[in-house]
Amino acid sequence: MYRLLLLVLVSSVCASPVAAQMSNQSPKILVVTAHPDDEVMFAATMYRVSHALGGSVDLALVTDGAGGYRFSTLAGAIYGLDLTDPETARTHLPAIRKRELMAGGLIAGIRNYMFLDQPDLGKTEDQDSILAFVWDRKFVAERLDYFLDKGDYDFVFTHLPIKPFHSHHKAATILAIQAVSRMDKNDRPIILGGFVTGMMDDVVAKFTELEGHPETRIFKDGPFTFDRSTPFGQDGRLNYNIIANWMIAEHKTQGTMQLFMRTEGVERYWVYQMNGRDAIGKTREMMKNVQEAPF
């Protein structure tokens, strides 16, 4: 019923001499998300890792994205389909959204895509029912174990699982944390929870852990950040909001997603306590490199 599709994008742009010189500071990142478009949360950091640090970014997508049809009105003319019709959407939207995801990923420098195609039946806040009754939890766990074993990652990015957020986001994060916790302690990557400013900032500021899931508890050190308004280019006239906005624009089926285009935003990362305190210093160093590496 479920299938795994691994697609490898080979960039036509060679690594810069600066990136090559910093190879010992070139992290390998696995991003675990629930839907196509969730990756935009980490847009600027992914871009800096892949383009300034010479690192790599892979993405494991848990759902098929079929539930994201309600605001697809404008995309209908582009794709020649009434994507607001549930049956039409569930037939065609998963493939369309994968193409949109990979178009945005080409901008950010995402290398590999692992599609787990779990059912996306629409929005709910109950992550436990998703894990118990909707997704094939055993299958997802096995695939995440495999990716982590073969990927030799330094860091895993997840959405910070705040309570009012979509249940799929929280469920994907829980499964990612549990997968890392099953690894030998000497081989574990550091797993982080991320959230950009400008959305539910008051809730994010109070977050300690998701009720009922102590594995999601975070250290209050940090957050460790990258400001999308960081200037670069001729006369410093460019900044990394452009990267996020370009990625958002690729998700044309997600009409309300377009309203998140902006001229500011800070990507923030917290360390889950299951990593141990040593992970705080390593995360601080990695994000310092993300902030300061020449472009």
Predicted regions and their residues:
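Metal-dependent de-N-acetylase/amidase catalytic core
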Residues: 2-3, 20-32, 129-295
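Sec-dependent N-terminal signal peptides
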Residues: 4-12
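A generic structural motif
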Residues: 8, 59-61, 190-196
